[in-house]
Amino acid sequence: MLTARVLTAVLICGVAGAETCTTQSAMTDTDRNALASAGRAMAEKVQANDAAGLQAMTIPEYAKDFGAIQGVVGNTAPKVKGASLVIEQVYLLDASDLKPGADGKPANAQFLCTLNRSIAAADFSIPSVPAGKYGFAIVEARGAAPWRLSFLIRQEQGKWQMAGFYPRPMTAAGHDGLWYWTAARTMVKSKEQWNAWLYYQQAEALLNPAALIQSSHLEKLRNEQNAAAPPALSSGVTADAPLVVKGADGAEYHFTSLGVDDSLAKDKIDITARLKVDQAGDPVVARKRNTDAMSALLAAYPELRKGFHGVWIFAEAPGQNPYATELAMGEIH
């Protein structure tokens, strides 16, 4: 499996301006043990659903407003219950000499780590970072459905405290990121460009520990995805550049995003699509519109029926809550 271990196992110290990145193979035993101990302790608090305990280990500016993180802990704890916690990787990120921006506010920091004897690299790009010493700990919660618990940590008065929490599943529908990457390549060869584009998306979500990390391996994945994208997806799918699909009755459906989802834990992942609408409407009208949008999407791109369990449609109207509908492929006509 292509995990953070493969992405970064042979990283050595790299320099980007005033910031330095030291990986566990290059750091001192003292630093390595301290970072690993902090990461494990934080992961244990998450596993125990001990939000108060994790709050006590959090930097002051986040500890004082902990509600959002508490919710994430509560959602993650059941996913990692009973799992074995294993320290996968730790990094020492030193921004002690980082200067504030021209406006006096904390500057963005970029920590560049180069792979030994190659041009490959991994990047940590962290916005609005006060000068100081930071670390990043990746903890695997190994079980039937493994998760990766990653923590940005900052040294405060000699103690390592949490400055960011990034929980992510390592599998979807029973498969890991490398499986989806390999499957996407097979789909490209079979001219299934739509399925491949979405499988590449799932692969990246499973392989990347956190959005603030980029690597040459992930860049390679994205380049493959972009090269294989069907023309309608060459510029992505956004609110400014929606995917427009016509239904059998001539109605147009404007999709502002196209992605994947594993929340139902079926044997295949689901497609998710966000639909731009003017009004949500009453539930009966909204559901029919959503199911008609599903039908139009699959009629336009029938290959999507093969690679996925079903479709989620989220109809979004300005100032209103999204209206969601999910159907299995066999229920969409």
Language-model features: where?
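Surface-exposed, charged secondary-structure patches
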Residues: G67-A144, G174, A232-D278
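Acidic, serine/threonine- and glycine-rich low-complexity intrinsically disordered segments
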Residues: P169-E252
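Short solvent-exposed beta->alpha transition segments
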Residues: T22-T30, A36-R40, A52-A120, E204-S234, ...
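Bacterial N-terminal signal peptides
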Residues: R5-V15
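N-terminal secretory signal peptides that target proteins for export/translocation
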Residues: M1-T3
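Short helix-adjacent coil turns
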Residues: M42-L54, A184, S190-W194
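Short beta-strand edge/turn micro-motifs at domain boundaries
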Residues: P106, Q110, V129-G174, E252-G281, ...
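Short, low-complexity N-terminal intrinsically disordered segments enriched in polar/charged residues
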Residues: A18-A48, G164-W179
